[in-house]
Regions:
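Glycine-rich phosphate/cofactor-binding loops in nucleotide/flavin-utilizing enzymes
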Residues: 113-151
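Glycine-rich beta->alpha junctions and the first turn(s) of the following alpha-helix
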Residues: 1-67
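Short, charged, amphipathic alpha-helical segments
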Residues: 53-60, 86-91, 120
Length: 151
């Protein structure tokens, strides 16, 4: 590889430098997926004579948590200094990832048997949730980073 194409010889330091921006750019993926899964839940809420009212998922709590996380994200962006908010960004992406997995699961169950077909929007969203959980830094990496920064 030509020397002119080498960004750095210290990959660990480079990763630490770009990490806040890298995480911040990924968060809207999770927020958008949560929003569209919540919309799917709403769209299917009254199917089959309202049977979904008996599901024990707290959809209103999901919506409230989504709004809180979204507000936290935009407050960080408004501050303009992502580097000073690394801990918050790590926690935020992790919280969004776990909420996304929960909401997507609820969306599939809420959608009934048609939600289990390979090309249903619920299954697509479920795959998006798994992708977000596995997107570097993964939920595992975020937990490790949190532990390292705390201690």
């Amino acid at each position: 590889m030509p020397q002119s194409q080498i960004i750095t010889h210290d990959a660990k330091q480079f990763a630490a430098t770009i990490r806040p921006q890298f995480i911040a750019y990924q968060i809207p993926i999770g927020l958008g997926s949560i929003k569209s899964s919540l919309e799917l839940i709403d769209a299917f809420s009254n199917v089959q004579n309202g049977i979904n009212q008996y599901l024990e998922y707290d959809v209103e709590a999901f919506k409230k948590r989504y709004r809180q996380l979204r507000e936290e994200y935009y407050a960080i962006l408004d501050d303009g200094n992502l580097t000073s908010h690394l801990n918050e960004l790590i926690s935020l992406k992790k919280d969004i990832g776990y909420l996304l997995l929960d909401v997507n699961q609820a969306s599939v169950v809420n959608g009934g048997s048609r939600a289990y077909t390979p090309y249903s929007p619920q299954v697509r969203k479920l795959k998006e949730g798994f992708f977000f959980a596995a997107l570097t830094p993964t939920l595992r990496h975020l937990g490790k980073l949190e532990a390292e920064l705390k201690g």
